[in-house]
Amino acid sequence: MSKIIGIDLGTTNSAVAVLEGTEPKIIANPEGNRTTPSVVSFKNGEIIVGDAAKRQAVTNPDTVISIKSKMGTSEKVSANGKEYTPQEISAMILQYLKGYAEEYLGEKVTKAVITVPAYFNDAQRQATKDAGKIAGLEVERIVNEPTAAALAYGLDKTDKEEKILVFDLGGGTFDVSILELGDGVFDVLATAGDNKLGGDDFDQKIIDYMVEEFKKENGIDLSTDKMALQRLKDAAEKAKKDLSGVTSTQISLPFITAGEAGPLHLEMTLTRAKFDDLTRDLVERTKTPVRQALSDAGLSLSDIDEVILVGGSTRIPAVVEAVKAETGKEPNKSVNPDEVVAMGAAIQGGVISGDVKDVVLLDVTPLSLGIETMGGVFTKLIERNTTIPTSKSQVFSTAADNQPAVDIHVLQGERPMAADNKTLGRFQLTDIPAAPRGVPQIEVTFDIDKNGIVSVKAKDLGTQKEQTIVIQSNSGLTDEEIERMMKDAEANAEADAKRKAEVELRNEVDQAIFATEKTIKETEGKGFDTERDAAQSALDELKKAQESGNLDDMKAKLEALNEKAQALAVKLYEQAAAAQQAQAGAEGAQATDNSGDDVVDGEFTEK
């Protein structure tokens, strides 16, 4: 069975891991980094992902960042003269991760476990699964990020019973999950969160502050300048990271814009105290989900044994202090906040493939599910924090006499009125026999699978007619769209592979030309003109092919040159070996001739 890789598809950074034996291992990207920026850029028809894309974000307007924040929406991004869905951009990141995982493993990868924030709704989960499919991956399981982190933390502690609180503050989302660990069972008791809170918001506070200060000083609003704004974003992210280790950092952006008198520069000092002041409201927002999760789990702070920090934003000192103050505990530092989620996903891949034994993962649905009933009321069928997979049915009836059809409006959320919750989808059950209101029996059944993806069935118990839908939100892609995007992704992968092969061939040609010219020069006047002339002729042919740019011709001429150059090199080595042998023979003969020169006669007297 092929390996199932674990992928943490993050807002700011992503990571991929694989199980080696029973240990999860993070796979480094081609640049040697263990996490990859979730950035995609387009240049001259080429798709660039990761570190290289992030480096050119300032100068390349066709760069897409933080696409995860748009997952599950119908919003598209414009780049490269086209419009892309969030699923397509995410698929490009997944394809890149998949590609370097395949290089590391030396085999094709077709299956993955992908993580999502615990508080992702159905549309966002479905979009993630679609992105995987477009990237050529069979998504074996969608796992909540805090749950994956708990798996990685607790894999070697399966004999120990404890309750842990996972505090996961990433680039764009925030989750808190409470789990009970014991006997290899990872049981999620409750989860809470905020899908609109993360490191990007902390960056934005610094950006707003820089824009405001610069405007006060120079009267120019940098927020209207796209390139300046990207430079501000880079500087804000760097300053935020610096302030995790030092109490003050210098922000220096020369030539940020131009005024009437000429170029203007942005120079300022940002202290940790000022940063804490700017982001106080964001840190405050992390407290409510912690309290909510504890309340839903029916636990008090004293019941929690360990607090695990996940996500790069948990390195912010004010966040760490807030966690300490809120939980009364020193956070556990045994896991790497940037890598632990991907490692947990790889472990779940091992559970699915059977490589990891005696581990059971019981996750929950983060939000309540139900339908709209008379008066616009939201009637819940499945309460939040219900263990999944699960199924729940309830019987409803018609609201009017002789009603021929019922509209089923499926919702997700916690508010009492339907209008205040998230619509997952609508469908209709038709051909209900004429009857007074309240007589027909319509059974509505909700199913949530292990990935947290919802399907709903409505059945007329009188006629046994039923209608089933797997929820397709307004951002959902049809099978045809996914198929088309998969083909596009495959074509891009082929084009990338072709481009890579072309670069490698050109490099080989350059190297061969250089090496052969050197050998021809070194063999001048050494007596094997036939081989030198043949190599020179093949070299001239390759140079012509190089100028023409015909790859097939270059390949053929390169092979011919290698053959002739090899023959020349053999002659050179044969000559060198013969000379060496002759020298060794001469030295041996000289030693023999001189062997009697230093002989002294001695006298021997017998006593």
Swiss-Prot record:
| Gene induction | By stress conditions e.g. heat shock.
User: What keywords are assigned to this protein?
Assistant: ATP-binding, Chaperone, Nucleotide-binding, Phosphoprotein, Stress response
Residues that bear Phosphothreonine: T173
What one GO molecular function would you report for this record? ATP-dependent protein folding chaperone
**What Pfam families does the annotation carry?**
HSP70
Here the segments flagged for biased composition (Acidic residues) are 595-607
Q: Please note every region of biased composition (Low complexity).
A: 579-591
> SUPFAM superfamilies annotated for this entry?
Actin-like ATPase domain, Heat shock protein 70kD (HSP70), C-terminal subdomain, Heat shock protein 70kD (HSP70), peptide-binding domain
Disordered: annotated segments: 579-607
Note whether Cytoplasm occurs among the keywords. no
Q: Which family does it belong to?
A: Belongs to the heat shock protein 70 family.
Its biological purpose is as follows: Acts as a chaperone.
UniProt name for this protein? Chaperone protein DnaK
